[in-house]
Swiss-Prot record:
PANTHER family: TRANSMEMBRANE ANTERIOR POSTERIOR TRANSFORMATION PROTEIN 1 HOMOLOG
Protein's UniProt name: Transmembrane anterior posterior transformation protein 1 homolog
Extent of Low complexity compositional bias: 468-477
Its biological purpose: Plays a role in primary cilia formation. Involved in cartilage and bone development. May play a role in the differentiation of cranial neural crest cells. May act as a downstream effector of hoxc8 during development.
Cellular component terms (Gene Ontology): centrosome; ciliary basal body; endoplasmic reticulum membrane
Topology of the protein relative to the lipid bilayer: Multi-pass membrane protein
Membrane-spanning parts: 108-128, 165-185, 233-253, 332-352, 400-420, 426-446
Pfam families attached to this UniProt entry: DUF747
GO BP terms, alphabetized: cartilage development; cell projection organization; cranial skeletal system development; developmental pigmentation; lens morphogenesis in camera-type eye; neural crest cell development; ossification; positive regulation of bone development
Database matches in InterPro entries: Tatp1
Region feature Disordered, mapped onto this chain: 1-23, 465-543
Length: 567
């Protein structure tokens, strides 16, 4: 009994203990839940404040991107040019090149202008004397009984032909009425005159391109050895073709001068302004095209010829105007501003054109000294013993400047403007002629000295002693062409020297040489040694169309410059 009671009390105590433990568990669970709830409330509160702080930071960042801060950043922003040093150095060199272009270009222009002046004065001074000497030889040679030699040398034959062409064309020009042409052109509208002037410029370039070919064909036909097979139409047809060409070209230049005279005498000067604006259109047609060194040389030669021709046209216009005003010196000052304006516009257009062409094509200003040396080489080589052409013809081939039509027009204008009456007038004419001869001789001496200096600076002396090349389709000429390219012994040039080669007269060649077509001696000059090796590999029996393309400055002639359009 006692055991059962004790067991029952023990069970009750266990149940009580279990209940107490449950209550403790429940109470501890409630406390945990309260703690968790309190902790969650604290976390939500902290998140709210954090979000609030982030919003405040965002508001402060937005306030930092204000207009004042942007302007401040733009004003204080820095950069470093030395990070692209090569680019900026190149740009600076381009600026320096553009600044050097006017000086170097005008050096070339002045040198080329005096070359054209030398050729132009030759027609008035030395050519009549050479023709007179040739005629004296022609008349006195049969009396001397020299039957085995030529009656006239080839150079004398060419001089006589030039003289006859000038005389015939001069008498033909008397049938052209300058006054009627002036009033006919003056009655046209401004637009018509502008179109006419542009057409005349194009026609002048075409005449210059084809005219020298006609004259060269006449000279070669008249001096070709008689033993050759007849492959031409004869000297007389060639002579009449040359006379017709010089006459038509002279009329063309007369129309140009008349149009310019009408522009000078217009009341509002609108035509003169339009004609001057035509020069600036030339910038558009030339600047934005690809140019190489040879193309720029062609354009430079064309600009020299154009400038000399324009100056001569201005002289003709001034003579005609002074004649109309009875040689009143006050009227000369009326023409002076217009003349200066035309000259200034011509110089400005040339400078701007060449400056931007060299800039866009990465050509240095030193290239103009090479062009000047090439022109000087022609002058020096024409004074050698083995010279194959007269210098006037060389300038005509190089620049496209043919002096005969322009000289013929100037003679026509001067003889119609100046009346020679009495012995005093004849004395004045003789003194003026002696003055022109003096000017021609002094100009030739100075040009020859300068040319020798330029050739020496360019290291082109050795090219002066090389024989002129030749080319012909036959095998004989091909063999002769190969022998021409062989180098001469080094002792021969040393014995003669440059000074002797430019002062002695050409020696007489055999009357029956191998069939050859004379070409420019300057074709021998090469700017790079690689070109000489390439040129030696060309087949000698190839025709003109199979020749290698021209790469050298001395090979550039008027065949490609008269159009003045380089694609």
């Amino acid at each position: 009994m006692a055991d059962s009671v004790a067991a029952g009390l023990g069970d009750e105590n266990e149940t009580e203990n279990e209940d107490k433990e449950r209550e403790k568990r429940l109470f501890s669970g409630v406390k945990k839940m309260e703690k968790q709830a309190a902790a969650s409330d604290v976390t939500e509160t902290l998140g709210f404040y954090e979000r609030k702080a982030k919003c405040k930071d965002r508001k402060t960042n937005v306030s930092d991107l204000s207009l004042v801060r942007f302007i401040s950043a733009e004003l204080t922003r820095g950069y470093f040019l030395e990070h692209n040093e090569a680019k900026y150095t190149e740009r600076r060199e381009r600026v320096y090149t553009c600044l050097r272009i006017p000086k170097e270009l005008e050096k070339l222009m002045i040198f080329g202008y005096f070359l054209c002046l030398d050729v132009f004065l030759y027609v008035f001074t030395l050519l009549p004397l050479r023709v007179l000497l040739a005629l004296v030889r022609l008349l006195t040679l049969p009396c001397c009984g020299l039957s085995g030699s030529r009656i006239l040398q080839p150079a004398q034959v060419c001089d006589v032909l030039k003289g006859f062409i000038m005389v015939l064309c001069y008498f033909m020009m008397h049938y052209v009425d300058y006054s009627m042409m002036y009033h006919l052109i003056r009655g046209q509208s401004v637009i018509k005159l502008y179109i006419i002037y542009n057409m005349l410029e194009v026609a002048d370039r075409l005449f210059s391109s084809f005219g020298q070919d006609i004259l060269d064909a006449l000279y070669w036909t008249a001096t070709e050895p008689k033993e050759r097979k007849r492959a031409h139409i004869g000297v007389i047809p060639h002579f009449f073709m040359a006379v017709l060409y010089v006459f038509l070209h002279a009329i063309l230049i007369m129309v140009q001068a008349t149009t310019l005279n009408v522009a000078f005498n217009s009341h509002n000067k609108s035509l003169l302004t339009i004609m001057m604006s035509n020069n600036f259109v030339e910038i558009k047609g030339s600047v934005f095209k690809k140019f190489e060194k040879n193309n720029l040389f062609q354009m430079s030669n064309s600009d020299i010829k154009e400038r000399f021709t324009n100056y001569t046209l201005l002289l003709i216009v001034c003579l005609r105007n002074m004649e109309q005003f009875s040689w009143n010196p006050d009227h000369l000052w009326v023409l002076f501003p217009d003349v200066c304006m035309v000259i200034a516009s011509e110089i400005a257009v040339d400078v701007v054109k060449h400056a931007f062409i060299t800039k866009f094509n990465d050509i240095t200003a030193d290239v103009y000294s090479e062009y000047r040396a090439s022109l000087a080489f022609d002058l020096v080589s024409s004074r050698q013993k083995n010279a194959y052409t007269d210098y006037s013809d060389s300038v005509s081939r190089r620049m496209g400047f043919i002096p005969l039509p322009l000289a013929l027009l100037l003679i026509r204008v001067v003889t119609s403007s100046v009346k020679i009456q009495g012995s005093l007038s004849i004395v004045c004419v003789l003194l003026f002629y002696l003055g022109m001869i003096t000017l021609k001789v002094l100009n030739s001496i100075v040009l020859l000295g300068k040319s020798c200096m330029y050739v020496k600076e360019a290291n082109m002396e050795e090219k002066l002693f090389q024989n002129p090349p030749s080319a012909a389709p036959s095998r004989v000429s091909s063999r002769a062409h190969r022998t021409k390219h062989t180098r001469e012994p080094p002792g021969d040039p040393a014995e003669e020297g440059m000074s002797a080669s430019v002062t002695t007269q050409p020696t007489q060649q055999d009357e029956c040489p191998a069939p050859q077509i004379p070409t420019s001696e300057s074709d021998q000059f090469l700017t790079t040694p690689d070109e000489s090796e390439e040129k030696s590999l060309i087949q000698d029996d190839s025709e003109l169309k199979h020749r290698a393309p021209k790469k050298d400055l001395l090979e550039i002639d008027r065949f490609t410059i008269c159009g003045n359009r380089i694609d």
